[in-house]
A protein has these predicted regions:
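Alpha-helical transmembrane segments of multi-pass membrane proteins predominantly involved
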Residues: 1-205
Length: 205
């Protein structure tokens, strides 16, 4: 999953970004399913199924169709160059490892490594949202961040199923909100580039 997060930062084609995100979601569902099996926590199988169906299949397909329908520019425009973004990603990953491994000294090694991995994925998702101008790739960054949250949550023993379900549905709701937002930008500015808003704001001053 961490490799997929770096691949999302590196990739400069929207459809490839969607494919990588779908692969990350599938890996998440496998990880959660494995946790459910090894820890005898059957309710996590529902979480794994939700991750697989929603973020591994439904959401990527929906975004793909939305891109085709809107005629969105297929290249990903970045605020920062790929090289600098990857270096920032490595720095954030190192930071997450140092923080988690230092804070969770009393926990077992498997839990510590899992939490460090989850935090790194969360930070890389935030980095993707910051360094991308295209609204669609920012949606993917947000959902990649949420993948990290779910991965961290599965490591918390006794996490109520209702919380996991609410997290899954919050992603679906956020998708609809972002979709409406994208359609509005396209309708008003004939672009899904967030920079279009900055130009309009500058013209109104």
């Amino acid at each position: 999953m961490l490799v997929a997060s770096f691949a999302l930062l590196y990739q400069d084609r929207i459809f490839a970004v969607l494919n990588i995100f779908a692969a990350q979601a599938i890996l998440l569902s496998m990880a959660v399913g494995w946790e459910a099996w090894t820890q005898q926590r059957p309710h996590l199988f529902i979480t794994a199924a939700l991750a697989l169906c929603l973020k591994g299949i439904i959401i990527p397909v929906a975004l793909h169709k939305m891109i085709v329908r809107l005629g969105v520019h297929r290249d990903v425009e970045q605020v920062v160059g790929v090289g600098k973004t990857l270096l920032l990603g490595l720095a954030l990953t190192s930071l997450s490892l140092m923080l988690v491994l230092k804070i969770t000294v009393a926990a077992d090694s498997f839990t510590r490594e899992g939490l460090a991995l989850a935090l790194a994925i969360i930070l890389l998702g935030m980095l993707m949202m910051i360094t991308r101008r295209n609204a669609v790739t920012q949606i993917v960054g947000f959902m990649s961040l949420e993948n990290g949250l779910i991965l961290a949550a599965t490591g918390a023993r006794g996490m109520p199923l209702v919380v996991e379900v609410s997290v899954a549905f919050s992603v679906l709701i956020a998708l609809f909100v972002f979709a409406v937002f994208v359609f509005r930008i396209r309708e008003r500015f004939d672009s899904v580039d967030i920079e279009a808003l900055e130009h309009v704001r500058g013209d109104t001053k």
